[in-house]
Amino acid sequence: TPSWEDDIFDAFKSAGVSQVPYVPDAGHAHLIRRVHADPTMTPLVLTTEEEGVASCCGAWLGGKKSVLLMQSSGVGNCVNMLSLVTNCNFPFLTIVSMRGEYGEFNSWQVPMARATQTSFEMMGIEVMRCNSPDEAGPTVDAALYSVFASEQKIAILLSQRLIGRKVW
């Protein structure tokens, strides 16, 4: 049976996503491998998450659909760049793997986890959340439709309960 990560990848394919900028992250590892293996998709490795916001906007200007993958700890790096999305009315979807919540061992992850949803909402980005495997595919599918059919701006938070807590 396909995993929830495969459901997300399948939603990308169905929606015609062809560019996937990302900062390497264990929470997105399976999805990133799938993107790299697909010749119709272009994975873009970033040095900082805010580059991904601009990359998604540029992809849209070039006639492509793009989704940004990042970890919650990188959301704070994007706040200023998100003004590009809202001021220019670009369609935008990011999928965020959460750290700093359910069973977190690393205290440095907690402050940004607490600020992630609020940071997006303050910048005019709608927030959706997936807590269980059966929510992932349908949530991403619905978000992709809203983003590219009506130029919405959405962040999907993949909870640490869904991804699995890290043990150190």
Predicted regions and their residues:
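Thiamine diphosphate
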Residues: T1-W168
